[in-house]
């Protein structure tokens, strides 16, 4: 336990002191839930984003970029205005506010996931739970919307929100994106950007932020075509699963190939399974150890309002336990259907049949001679409405007429005789459908922190350094003259400039002893130091020192860029 605390504190110190991450607005006392990326942290963050971006571009996906500020109508349609909430309570004495479920969970040691505000209030009263700040009485629990509210323009009649997810920017653009994809399913679209959640009480440092970065991928597909064409390439990939059944029975994780997971019913289909493999491979490519990754199926009460099945991809932290870093959610057609309903836009895809089909269709219209005098000017409008109804809507009218002999339509009571009902046969060449969506959603900040936590090494000789995956290092090469004297400095600087032009992230450093400089660059994860010593002017060679082994090899200067490229990028 002591080693764990020391490691955590050493990492916090390293991140602040060496320019990875620090609290935002420090000179004004800071603000909880906000962090700034320093020069080294920003490089690693961009490298994580690059790994994700390149992986999905290789799959043939499209990237877009949409605004952070979004009109209220979008989030009314998506359900976020009503459902993106957390339970909140307030101390009646000191006015402090807290996540009610967190307080109850900490005091009673129970799982509060999915408990209603009323149930949480009941537990607070039954167990006389008090304010953790002053011991005062807590108010009844209510729901607090986590979106940051704002206004678009100078007037308050146009409400907006900072987006809580990047996904909606993709969904509202579906019509244009579908045209870009030439009306062919499946296709994928991703967006990397900021999202915002006004967390009630952000805790655990970088793991719970009010402003954070996401990479969300929306894969649109025909729900009748749930098999991925390239599943054979990944079916033998072994993943660690923690399905619902094992959680409820305390059975622990199981290791299965993706093929086994699909056949045993843990994963719904090969389409879902393929992207599980892809997510795992991206995390490995970032540098997360395989034994620190697991796939945990969310319990029904944990799922977001739009999800019918979600697997969280979690990374293990020595200090915080298993941390959700990626969510893979089956969103069905929830989002697109909601936007169709609220906006009236046509967000369907035309699926063409291989051969035309003959289908039976119900057609209902008004018997204008009979209803004309009764409906008067509304008859034409109601008849047009009937022509625009879906088959499902027409079937409901037909069933109502068959059961009780009448229906109510736009305020009028109409009998079966008021309609002309026909069943006709039509030759159709395809059908329109609202696509379903599978969403892998990556956090960026959590994998960033957990990459560093899993990379920090504390040697027995008190050496602290980042054993980060070599191509993820913020500084890839340090060029060091053995001493700050000519001709070593001139040669070293020329090598530094050459490596810059070759595309390496490289620094030149001639200050302090070479031992101190090695330690300085080991600490921030620089995988290789190139040293120009007294032998260099004689034979045009330099040493390359390995961060992890501290061993050195000599290479000719002209071979240096290619050798470093091989060592760092493989």
Curated annotation (Swiss-Prot):
One of its GO terms (cellular component) is cytoplasm. GO terms for biological process: glycyl-tRNA aminoacylation. It is an enzyme of class 6 (ligase). Substrate binds at residues 99, 165, 212-216, 439-443. Keywords: Aminoacyl-tRNA synthetase, ATP-binding, Cytoplasm, Ligase, Nucleotide-binding, Protein biosynthesis. It comes from the Archaea. GO terms for molecular function: ATP binding; glycine-tRNA ligase activity; protein dimerization activity. This is Glycine--tRNA ligase. It comes from Thermococcus sibiricus (strain DSM 12597 / MM 739). The gene is glyS.
């Amino acid at each position: 336990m002591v080693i764990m605390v020391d490691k955590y504190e050493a990492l916090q110190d390293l991140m602040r002191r060496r320019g990875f991450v620090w609290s935002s607005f420090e000179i004004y006392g800071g603000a909880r839930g906000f962090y700034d990326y320093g020069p080294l942290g920003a490089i690693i963050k961009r490298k994580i984003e690059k790994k994700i971006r390149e992986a999905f571009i290789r799959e043939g996906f499209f990237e877009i970029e949409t605004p952070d500020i979004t009109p209220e109508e979008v989030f009314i349609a998506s359900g976020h205005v009503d459902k993106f909430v957390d339970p909140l309570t307030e101390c009646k004495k000191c006015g402090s506010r807290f996540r009610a479920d967190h307080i109850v969970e900490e005091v009673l040691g129970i799982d509060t996931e999915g408990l209603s505000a009323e149930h949480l209030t009941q537990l607070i009263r039954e167990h006389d739970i008090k304010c953790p700040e002053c011991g005062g009485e807590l108010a009844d629990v209510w729901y607090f919307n986590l979106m940051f509210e704002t206004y678009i323009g100078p007037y308050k009649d146009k409400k907006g929100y900072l987006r809580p997810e990047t996904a909606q920017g993709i969904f509202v653009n579906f019509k244009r994106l579908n045209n870009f994809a030439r009306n062919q399913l499946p296709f994928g679209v991703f967006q990397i950007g900021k999202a915002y959640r006004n967390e009630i009480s952000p805790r655990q440092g970088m793991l719970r932020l009010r402003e954070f970065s996401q990479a969300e991928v929306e894969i649109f597909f025909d729900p009748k075509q749930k098999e991925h064409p390239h599943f054979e390439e990944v079916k033998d990939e072994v993943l660690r699963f923690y399905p619902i059944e094992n959680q409820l029975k305390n059975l622990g994780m199981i290791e299965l190939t993706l093929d086994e997971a699909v056949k045993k019913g843990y994963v719904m289909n090969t389409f879902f399974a393929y992207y599980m493999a892809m997510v795992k491979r991206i995390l490995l490519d970032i540098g997360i150890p395989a034994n620190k990754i697991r796939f945990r199926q969310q319990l029904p009460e944990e799922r977001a309002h739009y999800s019918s099945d979600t697997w969280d991809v979690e990374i293990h932290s020595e200090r915080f336990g298993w941390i959700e870093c990626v969510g893979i959610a089956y969103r069905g057609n929830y989002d697109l259907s909601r936007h169709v309903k609220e906006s009236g836009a046509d967000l369907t895809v035309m699926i063409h049949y291989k051969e035309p089909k003959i289908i039976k269709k119900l057609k209902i219209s008004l018997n204008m001679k009979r209803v004309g005098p009764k409906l008067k000017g509304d008859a034409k409008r109601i008849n047009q409405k009937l022509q625009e109804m879906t088959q499902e809507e027409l079937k409901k009218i037909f069933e109502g007429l068959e059961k009780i002999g009448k229906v109510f339509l736009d305020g009028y009571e109409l009998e079966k005789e008021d309609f002309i009902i026909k069943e006709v046969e039509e030759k159709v060449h395809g059908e329109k459908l609202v696509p379903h969506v599978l969403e892998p959603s990556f956090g960026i900040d959590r994998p960033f922190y957990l990459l560093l936590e899993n990379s920090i090494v504390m040697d027995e000789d008190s050496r602290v350094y980042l054993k980060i995956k070599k191509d993820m290092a913020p500084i890839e090469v340090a060029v060091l003259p053995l001493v700050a004297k000519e001709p070593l400095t001139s040669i070293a600087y020329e090598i530094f400039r050459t490596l810059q032009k070759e595309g390496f992230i490289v620094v030149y450093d001639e200050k302090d002893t070479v031992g101190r400089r090695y330690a300085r660059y080991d600490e921030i994860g620089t995988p290789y130091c190139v040293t120009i010593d007294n032998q260099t002017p004689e034979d045009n060679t330099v040493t390359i020192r390995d961060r992890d082994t501290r061993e050195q090899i000599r290479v000719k200067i002209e071979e240096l860029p290619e050798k470093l490229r091989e060592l760092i990028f493989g």
